[in-house]
From Swiss-Prot:
Complex and partners: The glycine cleavage system is composed of four proteins: P, T, L and H.
Pfam families: GCV_T, GCV_T_C
Protein EC: 2.1.2.10
Protein name from the UniProt record: Aminomethyltransferase
Keyword Transferase: yes
Family: Belongs to the GcvT family.
SUPFAM superfamilies per record: Aminomethyltransferase beta-barrel domain (SSF101790), Folate-binding domain (SSF103025)
One GO term describing the cellular component: cytosol
EC category: transferase
Organism of derivation: Legionella pneumophila (strain Paris)
Task performed by this protein: The glycine cleavage system catalyzes the degradation of glycine.
Any one GO molecular-function label of the UniProt entry: transaminase activity
Gene label: gcvT
């Protein structure tokens, strides 16, 4: 039986086409994935992301624990209300999950994890927390909305209480604030400006309806996927997993090597890989002919082992097919993609196609 978010009946009332997403009954779209995509790029859209896993790490040992758990270093967070993106790796350097950690207070950190990896992630974090002065609290009583797009913040501010407006209007990128049991973060998964809002379950339907009345477009998983792909944002379980490392996934920037005595989990394995040199890298592909690149398709590189498409789709913004691919480091400027037995040329570039709504 699939799980349902508190907004399930609201989605149905909005005309959503529902699909099973890792055990959750979630909206794929509300009639037009294309219109939803463009709404986020040009105006404002909202996503129910209440299926995500929210874990609060409480106690005086929170920072010390997270410095051991994550590849990125939370010591970069210099004050309360800051957020940090990181990978969480196993001892072999394989990515268990990617996540955002928010410092709400010196003894209070919030981690938002992927839903598909919830059970494994929570068990891993709990096991690794032994010996640290921390307690873990999974917050299933909370719901989460992502409001994204160039007009997302303005439209959100128009429906908030004055106390919320005062706090939210001063947020900059990767900052967060708590107000009256509501949590606001200027983060997202679309490549656009916006907010992720976490509220008690009993408030989320009213929040959704208020945003709807303010002209924010409901958006489903389909648009969320094409938006994040255009922005070069990876999807766990598809673009990376425990068999891949941050260094070969375009996420080397999330690995902080100094100070050496931090000894985060997987540091030794990643240091060895760095010293030896990676054999594979993540690139962006733009198809040069008709066709759609999809996950799992082969990438043919002359004189090299095959690469593979990890994520691919049609880009509504660029109006052509784009993809993320893991390929040998020797890969040049052009490759061939095997699409249903036909070899179609594709241009190789950076694994990001759109920045703030504009082609990179």
């Amino acid at each position: 039986m699939t799980a349902k978010t508190p907004l399930h009946t609201t989605h149905l009332a909005c005309g959503a086409k529902m699909v099973d997403f890792h055990g959750w009954d979630m909206p794929l779209h509300y009639g037009s994935q294309l219109n939803e995509h463009h709404a986020v790029r040009n105006d404002a859209g909202m996503f129910d992301v209440s299926h995500m896993t929210i874990v609060d790490i409480l106690g005086a040992g929170g920072r010390q624990f997270l410095r051991k758990l994550l590849t990125n270093d939370v010591d970069q967070i210099t004050h309360n209300g800051k957020a940090l993106y990181s990978c969480m790796c196993n001892e072999h350097g394989g990515i268990i999950d990617d996540l955002i950690v928010y410092q709400r207070a010196s003894d209070n950190y919030r981690v938002v994890l992927n839903s598909a990896t919830r059970q494994n992630d929570v068990a891993w974090i709990r096991a690794k927390s032994e010996g640290f002065a921390v307690g873990l609290q999974e917050r299933r009583e909370l719901s989460m909305l992502a409001v994204q797009g160039p007009n997302a913040i303005a439209k959100t501010l128009s429906i908030l209480a004055p106390a919320h407006v005062d706090a939210v209007s001063t947020l900059t990128s990767f900052e967060c604030v708590d107000v009256d049991h509501w949590f606001f973060a200027r983060t997202g998964y679309t490549g656009e400006d916006g907010l992720e809002i976490i509220v008690p379950n009993e408030f989320v339907t009213q929040l959704w309806n208020d945003l709807l009345n303010a002209g924010v477009t409901p958006c489903g998983l389909g648009a969320r996927d094409t938006l994040r792909l255009e922005a070069g944002m990876l999807l766990y379980g598809q673009d990376m997993d425990e068999t891949t490392t941050p260094l070969e996934s375009g996420l080397a920037w999330t690995v902080k090597w100094e100070p050496e005595d931090r000894g985060f989990i997987g540091m030794g394995a990643l240091a060895s890989q760095k010293q030896q040199g990676i054999k594979r890298k993540m690139v962006g592909l733009t198809l040069l002919d008709k066709g759609i690149m999809r996950h799992g398709q082969k990438v043919i590189i002359e004189g090299c082992p095959d690469g593979i498409i990890t994520s691919g789709s049609y880009s509504p913004t660029l109006q052509q097919s784009i993809a993320l691919a893991r390929v040998p480091v020797e890969t040049g400027e052009q490759v061939l993609v095997d699409i249903r037995g036909k070899l179609i040329p594709a241009k190789v570039g950076k694994p990001r196609f759109i920045k703030q709504g504009k082609p990179v």
